[in-house]
């Protein structure tokens, strides 16, 4: 018995069983879920209707995530699933699907910010961070670069909820692609009201 997307096997609105008047059709087929996990990249191609292809990501460990307010995207490592709007089981098993809230490595975005604005993120108290901040501030730059950084300094401020995440080296992000269909696990960093909403959900879950 294959997975079928037809409705002929369902009972009618009054509860009566429907008579089977035809067999299952190829165009009504369904497939098993990909249940994409975090691990070394493993992608299978699936032949679909019309000779087209889908790419079934069985395991991925990186994705292309965008930082909307800064207009920048970077490829980064996915650390784990922390929240899922539809199913807690997907959080427990670290399953990557569209709309899953994940934690990603903040390093590529922190490096971009330090290069672009000449300032550090994630104010941690401690000698190592203070030394790194001083290193970034005192780095040798040409006068042209100094002028560029001075012009950008007005836009350097980011919201505190995102800044504090840089201190831990992990950022909350949402997956917006469909790993089981496209074979990619891309998304965007959570900010503003959306971040506040998911932070409330995460604290309520605990």
UniProtKB/Swiss-Prot annotation:
GO-annotated molecular function: structural constituent of ribosome
First-listed, main subcellular location of the protein, grouped into a coarse class: cytoplasm
Keyword Zinc-finger: no
GO cellular component, one term: cytosolic small ribosomal subunit
GO biological process, one term: translation
Homology family: Belongs to the eukaryotic ribosomal protein eS8 family.
Protein name in UniProt: Small ribosomal subunit protein eS8
